[in-house]
């Protein structure tokens, strides 16, 4: 549990600090070029979810964020009644714990924005020069934490599947 706190809390603070700096130093109409034709720092308000989808649903996303936080905390603090791992969700390993720590940091970071400002502050803008995303939608540290959490949980699920398959072959 300490590991999760020591990963989540600094990432949450990094998200808050970077958004604070963006609000103080980057105007909404004045992007800062970091790497020409590739990376800019911007100040964009996002009232929706990923890629700006489902705009103007702040109350809905506050509710979803609270459910996600509760879900992650139950997984971190709970255990199956028998004390053994009953499913993929309860099976602890480093990938699951990292994914939950990142999820907590990301969800809490964006939830804080929604509660304080009524929207999420996005500021990292990459132009990947691909036709379907030119430029790639702006995002923030919390969004990156959530995306990496999903990847870590997928790795966790494949590792658990492999363990179940190996156990069945014995």
Q: What would you call each of these model-derived segments?
A:
Residues 1-170:
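Alpha-helical transmembrane bundles and membrane-interface segments of multipass inner-membrane proteins
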């Amino acid at each position: 549990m300490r590991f999760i706190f020591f990963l989540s809390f600094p990432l949450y603070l990094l998200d808050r600090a970077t958004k604070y700096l963006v609000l103080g130093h980057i105007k909404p109409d004045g992007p800062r070029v970091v790497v020409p034709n590739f990376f800019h720092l911007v100040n964009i308000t996002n009232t929706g979810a990923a890629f700006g989808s489902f705009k103007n649903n702040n109350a809905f996303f506050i509710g979803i964020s609270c459910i996600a936080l509760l879900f992650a905390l139950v997984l971190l603090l709970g255990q199956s009644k028998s004390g053994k791992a009953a499913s993929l969700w309860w099976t602890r390993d480093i990938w699951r714990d990292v994914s939950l720590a990142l999820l907590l940091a990301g969800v809490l970071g964006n939830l804080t924005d929604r509660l304080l400002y009524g929207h999420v502050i996005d500021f990292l803008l990459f132009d990947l020069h691909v036709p379907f995303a030119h430029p790639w939608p702006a995002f923030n540290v919390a969004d990156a934490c959530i995306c990496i959490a999903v990847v870590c949980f997928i790795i966790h699920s494949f590792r658990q599947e492999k363990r179940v398959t190996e156990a069945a072959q014995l």
